[in-house]
Regions:
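Gram-negative outer-membrane beta-barrel transporters
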Residues: 91-96, 111-207, 241, 270
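Residues that define the transmembrane beta-barrel architecture of outer-membrane proteins
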Residues: 18-20, 69-73, 116-120, 175-179, ...
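Signature of Gram-negative outer-membrane beta-barrel scaffolds
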Residues: 1-31
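Residues on the lipid-exposed face of transmembrane beta-strands in outer-membrane beta-barrel proteins
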Residues: 24-28, 75-79, 122-126, 136, ...
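Outer-membrane beta-barrel translocator domains and adjoining extracellular loop/strand segments
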Residues: 1-10, 48-57, 61, 100-108, ...
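C-terminal beta-signal and adjacent terminal beta-strands/loops
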Residues: 198-206, 224-271
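Membrane-embedded beta-barrel scaffold of Gram-negative outer-membrane proteins
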Residues: 29, 35-37, 41, 64-149, ...
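Transmembrane beta-strands of outer-membrane beta-barrel proteins
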Residues: 1, 36, 86-90, 134-136, ...
């Protein structure tokens, strides 16, 4: 990452960090149509990567810090049922982020923060009958700010740093519950209709959990008509009810607003 101060300051700050990420997993198949797996993966978040959307300030004070490190542990299972037409999945996982940038006891910014997310994922995908297909999923995320560093409870002139009172709060922009449902049905050989919904819990925009955007449910629909074996027409309508909702909150005064009702008509060619 790189920042350049305002005109006249003539200050350029650069950060060049190398990091190595990897993943490993093991799968066991007790029967032909089922499997159980365990996996471990790492990733990294360089300094300043989130600065473009305003969720992270890009300042000279943080440019020499290490990348944030993420570790994910997962245990899950996958099963094919109904003659392999329908796939069922379930997983539990933990994601730990360390080296998070936070204020230290001396008032400087250091890699001392930590967050943790424990989650459950359930999924269904495939065909219930030859004409009826379904895709559904549910996710539960128990997120926590484990260590938010220190906060100044004194003044600028006489700072007094104490452990962050937001420790234990829900992590910003991590919904506790979310679910999706999409289903299609072949009404006629040439005509397929589909409908679905997306549900999301409220999310907080700050560590103190005092600013948030409410949860929402969005409904979508689709119609596809096969003109012949090579051409089909498809109409997708998103946010059928034209609901106003927000997908992300920030610690400042603004949030990310989602699109209103929209429609897309497409022509698909297959050869």
């Amino acid at each position: 990452t790189k920042i350049t101060a305002k005109a006249g300051d003539q200050v350029t700050v650069e950060n060049n960090k190398d990091f190595f990420n990897y993943q490993a997993g093991l799968t066991f198949k007790p029967v032909e149509n089922g499997s159980i797996y365990i996996s471990y993966a790492t990733s990294a978040n360089p300094v300043g990567v989130d600065g473009g959307d305003g969720s992270e300030g890009i300042t000279a004070a943080i440019q020499n810090l290490k990348p944030e490190e993420v570790k994910t542990y997962e245990l899950g299972t996958k099963w094919d049922v109904l003659n392999d037409k329908l796939n069922l999945t379930a997983a539990i996982f933990r994601t730990e982020k360390t080296n998070t940038r936070a204020t230290a006891e001396d008032g400087t910014t250091q890699n001392i923060g930590e967050t943790r997310v424990d989650g459950i994922e359930l999924g269904v995908n495939g065909n219930i009958t030859e004409k009826w297909a379904v895709s559904a999923g549910y996710t539960y995320l128990d997120s926590e700010l484990v260590d938010g560093g220190y906060t100044n409870v004194g003044s600028t002139a006489v700072p007094v740093y104490q452990a962050n009172p937001s420790n234990g709060n829900q992590v910003q922009n991590v919904a506790k519950n979310s679910a999706t449902l999409w289903t299609t049905y072949q009404v006629l050989p040439e005509l397929t209709l589909g409908a679905g919904a997306v549900a999301m819990d409220k999310v907080y925009g700050n560590a103190t959990n005092t600013k948030w955007v409410p949860g929402y449910v969005r409904y979508d629909a689709m119609a596809r008509y096969n003109v012949n074996k090579n051409v089909d027409l498809q109409l997708n309508v998103n946010n059928l009810s034209d609901k106003r909702y927000f997908t992300k909150a920030y610690s400042s005064h603004y949030a990310t607003e989602a699109e209103g009702r929209s429609a897309v008509l497409s022509v698909n060619f297959k050869y």
